[in-house]
Amino acid sequence: MTEQRPLTIALVAGETSGDILGAGLIRALKERVPNARFVGVAGPRMQAEGCEAWYEMEELAVMGIVEVLGRLRRLLHIRADLTTRFGELKPDVFVGIDAPDFNITLEGNLKKQGIKTIHYVSPSVWAWRQKRVFKIGRATDLVLAFLPFEKAFYDKYNVPCRFIGHTMADAMPLDPDKNGARDVLGIPHDAHCLALLPGSRGAEVEMLSADFLKTAQLLRQTYPDLEIVVPLVNAKRREQFERIKAEVAPDLSVHMLDGLGREAMVASDAALLASGTAALECMLAKCPMVVGYRMKPFTFWLAKRLVKTDYVSLPNLLAGRELVKELLQEECEPQKLAAALLPLLANGKTSHAMHDTFRELHQQIRCNADEQAAQAVLELAQ
């Protein structure tokens, strides 16, 4: 940044979640430095905020080993080209947003050229492949972390890291409107309500849906008024779930929803879900939950040896204890899942205590992440 040249920030986002984060960061930076310039790899939201897209984000948004191998030459070309062009541009700061397999190497290339680098969103190095922390430390001047235990992990290895809070915690109210959500979904205010979220990936839906449906059948024996909501991320997952339901529980009445996962969580007395970001969202929705997860036996055996944390769900990792029940592999079966959910549907002491802890954890990670990220970028640009 000089008198002649405006503040110049280079960014690379590789998927929709990164595009959303990038747009929020650009917005917060423009409020402080209206004439700043933003360039890089951007999706529609970042471009709408004024980011010049040298490449479209879709170029990087490939999933799965086969797809990555098929596009490898193109991905390597893009990374080499960005290394050259950013090297010539000399931005004040480079921000790699998530997409660690692409961005961390790029960050390292740029840092060698004297460009300051930030990695925005920590990979799960605290959970597995922990040695990646050394590569991240060499490649970046700063990591921006969503969660406090991530910063504690980086501190242990003397890698500069700033905890900025979680954007999802900023977006969701501390006290959600349960009856308002029920009105949206057509659920009576006085009914018991259970949300089933068997995951967003095909393999998860295939592995979990039957047990989740059988669990709901057991719970309806205790609560005949039980309303069951099943938000599904897209038409493919809905079709898959409908097929499994027709085989396992054809007579069980459920509300299948296209999207509306957040509304389903807010409306429900309890949720049964696969692990992942959904567990964090459910915590922020203040919906008591049970986590059920299954994977192929060899994958689970491998995961047990690679994963270095005591828990799989983010609420438990944040709390540092088993706040929500995690039933994995053989434990993830209808009788045990139903037994864990029953006290939550009773809306008694157990669910109230869980709700209060969820609220405390929400406050801990509600720190205005966009503003914090913008502040970190500007401090590094000085």
Curated annotation (Swiss-Prot):
Superkingdom assignment: Bacteria
Annotated GO biological process: lipid A biosynthetic process
Designated name of the protein: Lipid-A-disaccharide synthase
Function field: Condensation of UDP-2,3-diacylglucosamine and 2,3-diacylglucosamine-1-phosphate to form lipid A disaccharide, a precursor of lipid A, a phosphorylated glycolipid that anchors the lipopolysaccharide to the outer membrane of the cell.
Record lineage: Bacteria, Pseudomonadati, Pseudomonadota, Gammaproteobacteria, Enterobacterales
Keyword Lipid biosynthesis: yes
EC number: 2.4.1.182
Enzyme's top EC category: transferase
Entry-linked InterPro entries: Glyco_trans_19
GO CC terms: membrane
Reactions it catalyzes: 2-N,3-O-bis[(3R)-3-hydroxytetradecanoyl]-alpha-D-glucosaminyl 1-phosphate + UDP-2-N,3-O-bis[(3R)-3-hydroxytetradecanoyl]-alpha-D-glucosamine = lipid A disaccharide (E. coli) + UDP + H(+); a lipid X + a UDP-2-N,3-O-bis[(3R)-3-hydroxyacyl]-alpha-D-glucosamine = a lipid A disaccharide + UDP + H(+)
Annotated GO MF terms: lipid-A-disaccharide synthase activity; phospholipid binding
UniProtKB keywords: Glycosyltransferase, Lipid A biosynthesis, Lipid biosynthesis, Lipid metabolism, Transferase
Pathway in which this enzyme or protein is active: Glycolipid biosynthesis; lipid IV(A) biosynthesis; lipid IV(A) from (3R)-3-hydroxytetradecanoyl-[acyl-carrier-protein] and UDP-N-acetyl-alpha-D-glucosamine: step 5/6
Family the entry assigns: Belongs to the LpxB family.
